[in-house]
């Protein structure tokens, strides 16, 4: 069965979120940046806490570094297990892509990107000092992130 998500507007233009043809009120929370990188932590700490809070939806970070640990090789097993856990807990997910930048830093890029500062050059501070953040002018980095995000989007449709 194909799941449907849409916003239906009334005669005044006010929208209501519908999930599978039923109105849906998001009672949501957002996970800490790295919480979703550990299945056992999610199992023991996060899902029980979300239930205590009577949430029905969680914004779940998906870090590029966990999807493409080796360039061009995509592994969605962590995400697939998180989706399985969420379904078991009757929790809706809103997936947040952590790609090249999160809060202005390149914290969640794969190791192969972090190690190759020639191909994925860093931004510099005003005085010329090198930062650890990949430059938004680095076309190689933007293309690599876009490729990974495209695979992610196809996988999660």
Regions found by a protein language model. Name each.
Residues 21, 86, 141-145:
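Short low-polarity hydrophobic stretches
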Residues 1-55:
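N-terminal carbohydrate-binding accessory modules
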Residues 42-122, 153:
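Aromatic-lined substrate-binding rim segments of carbohydrate-active enzymes
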Residues 26-38, 61-79, 124-155:
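The substrate-binding groove and active-site-proximal loops of carbohydrate-active enzymes
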Residues 12-14, 28, 103, 117, ...:
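Feature targets compositionally biased, intrinsically disordered low-complexity regions
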């Amino acid at each position: 069965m194909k799941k449907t998500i849409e916003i239906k507007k009334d005669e005044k233009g006010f929208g209501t979120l519908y999930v599978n043809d039923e109105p849906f009120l998001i009672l949501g929370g957002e996970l800490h940046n790295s919480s979703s990188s550990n299945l056992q932590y999610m199992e023991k700490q996060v899902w029980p806490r979300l239930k205590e809070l009577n949430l029905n939806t969680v914004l779940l970070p998906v870090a590029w570094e966990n999807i493409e640990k080796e360039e061009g090789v995509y592994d969605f097993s962590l995400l697939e297990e998180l989706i399985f856990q969420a379904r078991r807990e009757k929790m809706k997910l809103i997936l947040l892509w952590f790609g090249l930048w999160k809060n202005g830093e390149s914290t969640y890029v794969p190791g192969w990107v972090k190690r190759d500062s020639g191909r994925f050059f860093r931004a510099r501070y005003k005085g010329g000092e090198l930062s650890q953040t990949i430059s938004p002018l680095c076309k190689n980095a933007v293309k690599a992130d876009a490729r990974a995000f495209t695979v992610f989007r196809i996988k999660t449709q």
